[in-house]
UniProtKB/Swiss-Prot annotation:
Keyword Ribonucleoprotein: yes
Known partners and oligomeric status: Part of the 50S ribosomal subunit. Contacts protein L32.
Listed GO biological process terms: translation
Family indicated by similarity: Belongs to the bacterial ribosomal protein bL17 family.
Organism of provenance: Variovorax paradoxus (strain S110)
GO molecular function per UniProt: structural constituent of ribosome
Name this polypeptide is given: Large ribosomal subunit protein bL17
NCBIfam families assigned: L17
Length: 132
């Protein structure tokens, strides 16, 4: 019996689905905000939250587990060097999903996935431009 197993299938094979989620995790860690469909965003949240929790304790074993799941050295470095300490006091809920309406081509519901305490770059750039 299949009592509530695993992730949504998202109309993909298991290898494609895992690779897609891995790429989305790397993109979210690198850019701290990505645009995707709502079902993909909800699945991304389920896999990225434990990764950030793992990064709060920077042991060698945790870094190896993170590299095993991400397969990107730069993402692991940023995860443990920047995101882990940033979310050290937060007991979960590291991501925010904002619904953005529907995609033009196929009317798919779109969402913005972002890390909650990310620094605002646009405001800093506007202040620097005004100061000059």
């Amino acid at each position: 019996m299949r009592h509530g197993h695993g992730l949504r299938k998202l109309n993909r094979t298991s290898s494609h689905r895992l690779a897609m989620l891995q790429n989305m995790m790397n993109s979210l860690i690198e850019h701290e905000v990505i645009k995707t469909t709502v079902p993909k965003a909800k699945e991304l949240r389920r896999v990225i939250e434990p990764m950030i929790t793992l990064a709060k304790k920077p042991t060698v074993a945790n870094k190896r587990l993170a590299f095993d799941r991400l397969r990107d050295r730069d993402s692991v470095v940023k995860l443990f060097g920047e995101l882990g300490p940033r979310f050290a006091a937060r007991p979960g809920g590291y991501t925010r999903i904002l619904k953005m309406g529907f995609r033009v081509g196929d009317n798919a519901p779109m969402a913005l996935v972002e890390l909650v305490d990310r620094p605002e770059i646009k405001e800093e750039a506007a202040e620097q431009g005004a100061a000059e």
